[in-house]
Amino acid sequence: MKKKILLIQPENREINNFRKKQFNNFVQITIPYLAAFIDEGQYKITLVDEYNQKIPFNIAFDLIAITVNTPNAYHCYDISRIFRVKGAKVVLGGPHVTLLPEEAKNHCDYLIIGEGENTWPQFLQDFYNGNAVERYVSITPPVLKNLPVPRWDLLKHRTAIMKGAVFATRGCPYHCRYCNLKQIYHDCFRTRPKDEVIHEIMQLKSRYFVFWDDNFFSDKPYAIDLMKNLAPLNKKWAAQVTLVDCADDELLKAAKSSGCLYLFIGLESFSDVSLIDAGKQINRVADYQKIIQNIHKYKIMVQAGIIFGFDTDTAKVFENTLQACEQLGIDGATVSILTPLPKTPIYDQMKEEGRLTADNWSYFNGKTGVAYIPKNMTPQQLYNGYVDFRKKFYSLPSFIKRIRVSKTRIPYNFIMNLGYRLAIRKPARHSERKLFPFQMVL
């Protein structure tokens, strides 16, 4: 007899309204990917992406699987509690569970810790047979070969341009102090067989997709070969890369030829001192203009990742950053407040210094609150400066200044900027919730 399984992609309620209005939003790959490992002879599968679907609490399931990120951890625990009261078993996995399994175990029946290619299928078989254990831990790095194609057919698609997603590589060679990637994945960079990646891309119904890689250009020969094989498919895509790799004309030429629309690049700051604080010395502000001009030369847009709130940032950082973005022709910006995620060097430093102000993970989303005491401004100044920067950056005058420099994919560029502009008109924050939780974490 088949067991009924529900896989949930939870959405951070603090920023869901903001994300829905972004035209360049893209789908999450996790639950369609996990669903592909499930034997439909043993399980009846239901997928729910909370971004655009409601969780069916009124339906009985045997097993609930939830992927947990730090900002939505408490929300996931609430979902788990409701289903467990109804008699369902709950398995939790994802970044937050991997980082804090001792916390997560109090809110579920089973844990998947670390990468799941080996442990998830084993758990599913054990659960079906009635002998599942509490913890499944990834001991060795999974070989990313012969992986199943994500079950996009089971998912209600988001209203977005980028309706497809695939990953070709896993890992990143760098050690940024705010990033918890090294604590989530095995510390080794891996690639998938190129023919398997191309086959998976061919299965995507949408022409537009995103590479869900942490650093797509890390292995140059692999990336170039993959892009050469991608070119005949006439797809349009985006990926996350590092700035230094974009000085390479061979990579950019292959990206343009294979349909690259934009590259997400973590600039993080326009201050070399702040970049040192971030542990991102691979970026040099003196290189920004030349490399960004090089990217634009190949008609590829730049979506810059920018973080406010490093210890060397002052109240002047917002206006200085805006001027720099306009001078460089930055096409789009994904802007965040520095978030001391658990197990990162920045989290450990701030905890030791007594500067963490929240013990509720919902404050750790980088968008709607400040979870620590900044060094050179108040939390209110940091938040207000962040909000003001986004409004100014996505204003029409700023767009005109930037597009005059960029001159890249103007229609798409305008649509992308308009989407962000509509999204930031009203801060996505619950009225009953304090913005700055001044409860010191010991």
Residues covered by each model-derived region:
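Structural detector of well-ordered beta-strand residues that form the stable sheet scaffold
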Residues: V91-L92, I112, R135-Y136, A238-Q240, ...
